[in-house]
């Protein structure tokens, strides 16, 4: 499977393969509250490659925000999806034992190390500023709806 950063934001194709190895779960995993949003605070162990766990999380969720708890841009992005009444998965990198390895993997996947790193419908759309721009242009919600439509069709089969 190939994921690409949205053409709306513009950049290169990023090859990524889905893998069944490693899940974004761990003994200290917690669930967020409100609107079904969830947070991962622990992501397994170092033996499981961060890239595989990132890929699986992105594949299993329509909206994923890789964040840090102290990041104001991350809060801005989470608030945007909350205000849009869109469920999302949050992975707080600073709460993970191997958070720096996950951030390194995200850097290799997206070309940028900063947070937030936001994926919608398996597509990297950028950071908070990119996401807000897509929303103002009326392009963000259609991306989210595409994912929900795809998931609905998958459930019908």
Swiss-Prot record:
Keywords attached to this entry: 2Fe-2S, Disulfide bond, Electron transport, Glutathionylation, Iron, Iron-sulfur, Metal-binding, Mitochondrion, Phosphoprotein, Redox-active center, Transit peptide, Transport
InterPro entries in UniProt: Glutaredoxin, Glutaredoxin_euk/vir, Glutaredoxin_subgr, Thioredoxin-like_sf
Modified residues (Phosphoserine): 20
One GO MF term attached to the UniProt entry: protein-disulfide reductase activity
Binding site for [2Fe-2S] cluster: 62, 147
Disulfide bonds: 71-74
Subunit architecture: Monomer; active form. Homodimer; inactive form. The homodimer is probably linked by 1 2Fe-2S cluster.
Name by which UniProt lists this protein: Glutaredoxin-2, mitochondrial
Chain's gene name: GLRX2
